[in-house]
Amino acid sequence: DKLVMALPAYANDYAVTGGIKGRQIYQSVPDSINGILPSPTWLCYEKVNMYLYDGTDGNRHLFYASDARSTEALLELADELGISQIGFWHFNSVDPQMWDTAAKWQKK
């Protein structure tokens, strides 16, 4: 039997005000920032960076995206679980550094 761990490589953007539905976006940063993107907050249980920002639509948004840091954390989990095969689930929004992180893990 083979077990393969699928790693996320995409982003989600949710308006937390205004009653707007969340949407999956295909990039590593939000496209509708009003001002400067604040520093991320690390969500240890999700192993991903989260940003709260004010959008150009006038709503407050919660945005999170997979990146090299989140990939590294999930690869460490794969090691802990003894999983030696991985795959990525992505929609053209991959942080290029994720590939470097995965390649380093694969060489171990």
Q: What is each stretch, according to the model?
A:
Residues D95-K108:
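C-terminal helical cap(s) of enzyme catalytic domains, especially alpha/beta-barrels
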Residues D1-V4, L81-I86:
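Loop/turn elements at helix/coil->beta-strand transitions in domains of secreted/extracellular proteins
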Residues L75, W89-F91:
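C-terminal functional modules
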Residues K2-E76, W105-K108:
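Glycan-binding loop/region signatures in secreted carbohydrate-active enzymes
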Residues N12, F91-Q97:
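Acidic-and-aromatic substrate-binding clefts and catalytic sites of carbohydrate-active enzymes
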